[in-house]
């Protein structure tokens, strides 16, 4: 009887360790993925918000909850958020990652107290991911 219980325990343990998924959120098909730079280029050219799979290297990640990360670009970064659908590990900086979702324009109001700048706002492009996959 002890052998049977032990065998069942070992079997369950092996099965639990076997399927370590490398994605979070919506599953991603990576064969049609484009670089972050190419995705931004296409978004600026069409101004359409279509679902796309992008990939790149993570430059930064939220160290509080893992609620956003930023892709490296040559002269800046692209912020990726998840609309509270999931979070990512906090130790993914410098790792390559895929994301499925869409680009969008976000208006950031000026936080300066100067009355000249109060009416000014800055439009930035961000990416809203529905799933991510680690390379």
Please state what every model-predicted region is.
Residues 17-135:
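OB-fold and OB-like single-stranded nucleic-acid-recognition modules
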Residues 1-15:
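Sec-dependent bacterial lipoprotein signal peptides
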């Amino acid at each position: 009887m002890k052998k049977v219980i032990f065998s069942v325990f070992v079997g369950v343990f092996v099965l639990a360790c076997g399927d370590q998924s490398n994605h979070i959120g919506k599953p991603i098909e990576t064969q049609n993925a484009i670089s972050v730079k190419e995705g931004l280029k296409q978004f600026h050219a069409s101004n359409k918000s279509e679902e796309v799979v992008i990939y790149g290297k993570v430059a930064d990640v939220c160290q509080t909850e893992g609620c956003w990360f930023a892709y490296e670009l040559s002269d800046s970064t692209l912020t990726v958020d998840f609309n509270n659908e999931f979070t990512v590990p906090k130790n993914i900086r410098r790792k390559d990652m895929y994301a499925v979702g869409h680009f969008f324009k976000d208006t950031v109001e000026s936080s300066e107290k100067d009355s000249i700048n109060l009416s000014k706002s800055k439009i930035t492009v961000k990416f809203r991911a529905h799933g991510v996959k680690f390379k």
